A protein has these predicted regions:
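Metal-cofactor-dependent catalytic cores
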Residues: 1-155
Length: 155
């Protein structure tokens, strides 16, 4: 089914996810804009090098899914993405403004597989780097297509 068009089928599908003793969804409410953590439509951009550095400080491999990134890149130096703020980049044929760092919340402490809080991400970031930021927000300035293995170009 197509969740955007088949509302009844979507609600029926959701019913199986909800506890029987809780109120059930009865309608779909659409927002006028995307639901993001920013007041603008944003894309989260993270690097595997920064993740490896953070994982080393925590003493355990942190899953990429813990940080819910839209775009992950290889090949950058750890934490170099913060130097891109204020610049414009191209990924594939899409172009973006690098807007700001992503300040993290307690959700990053939860293991995405188990739901248990098993890593003190915020204190680790603060102790080693003096901030609670991991990743950067992008704002699209030109629509286009991005694919796995596309290079990042600075404009």
């Amino acid at each position: 089914f197509a969740p955007d068009g088949d509302t009844a089928d979507f609600l029926a599908w959701c019913k199986n996810l909800m506890p029987q003793d809780r109120a059930q969804s009865v309608k779909v409410v659409r927002a006028d804009v995307g639901m993001t953590d920013t007041p603008y439509t944003s894309i989260s951009h993270l690097t595997t090098a920064s993740l490896a550095d953070l994982s080393g400080k925590i003493g355990a491999d942190m899953a990429q899914t813990r940080f819910r990134g839209n775009i992950w890149i290889d090949g950058a130096e750890p934490w170099d993405e913060f130097n891109w703020i204020g610049k414009e980049i191209r990924v594939g044929t899409a172009e973006f403004e690098v807007v700001e760092p992503i300040t993290r919340c307690l959700a990053t402490h939860a293991n995405p597989q188990t739901g248990e809080r098993d890593a003190d991400v915020l204190n680790t970031l603060t102790q080693h780097w003096g901030h609670k930021d991991f990743g950067i927000y992008l704002r699209a300035t030109k629509s286009g297509h991005a694919s796995v293995q596309d290079k990042i170009e600075f404009l």
